[in-house]
Regions:
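Short alpha-helical segment of the dimerization/phosphotransfer core of two-component systems
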Residues: 40-45
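Conserved glycine-rich
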Residues: 196-197
């Protein structure tokens, strides 16, 4: 986690020094590029800080969830458009939403799906294909996010939701240029548990990774155990 915080801070400080020196004043295109990098790193740092605070609140049972019947289509459409615009490689989304709603906190569910899409793009091949599907069982809204990425070993699948854990496949990809937060999947797991739901991973190395989320339907007590 310290490394994840130091890297964006170092980049921001480097850009600040370059701007302060005036060396880029006569090079507006390069100056704008570095300012964009600093903004991106600031966003990464802000996201990491929010994850740490949210996980801390979840662990201490102090995070309030505003669960309502939320529309899934607007959440997913907004996220797919965002990631298509920012991705540095081709990304194709295949969407099939049989279940149109879920009983959840709108903002936190959006963050969960965003984390899963972000991971799918980071730890993927040069051309990314992401399937997002939903369906409804008798007691659950079921949401799946599947990619054609590097995959995760069976050993890593057992620990991938632990705090600060990053699987070997992700580490390999990171050395090749991807970056990410070790808290990401723990954050996802904690938020889903706060919804009294469950998340599972299924993966084959070199082929795909699929995350499946079970969110209980709205009931008087809303207490289900898988």
């Amino acid at each position: 986690m310290i490394h994840d915080m130091k890297t964006p801070l170092s980049t921001i400080m480097m850009v600040q020094d370059m701007l302060k020196s005036g060396r880029l004043d006569s090079k507006p295109e390069i100056k704008n590029k570095y300012m964009s990098i600093a903004k991106s790193e600031t966003d990464h740092l802000f996201a990491l800080t929010n994850k740490i605070l949210t996980i801390s609140k979840l662990e201490n049972h102090k995070l309030e969830m505003n669960k309502t019947e939320v529309e899934l289509t607007p959440i997913i459409e907004k996220l797919t458009e965002k990631f298509k615009a920012k991705a540095q490689k081709p990304v194709n989304f295949i969407i099939s939403l049989q279940a149109k709603t879920a009983y959840a906190d709108n903002d936190y569910l959006g963050e969960v799906i965003s984390n899963l899409i972000d991971n799918a793009i980071k730890y993927s091949k040069e051309s990314v294909e992401i399937h997002i599907t939903t369906e409804e069982s008798e007691r659950y809204t079921i949401l799946k996010v599947r990619d054609n990425g590097l995959g995760i070993s069976e050993t890593d699948q057992r620990i991938i939701f632990q705090k600060y854990e990053r699987a070997a496949a992700a580490k390999r990809s990171r050395r090749n240029g991807a970056s990410g937060f070790g808290l990401g999947l723990n954050f996802v797991d904690q938020v889903i548990k706060a919804h009294e739901g469950r998340i599972f991973v299924n993966s084959i190395e070199g082929e795909f990774t699929e995350f499946t989320i079970y969110l209980p339907l709205e009931t008087p007590n809303n207490k289900h155990i898988l």
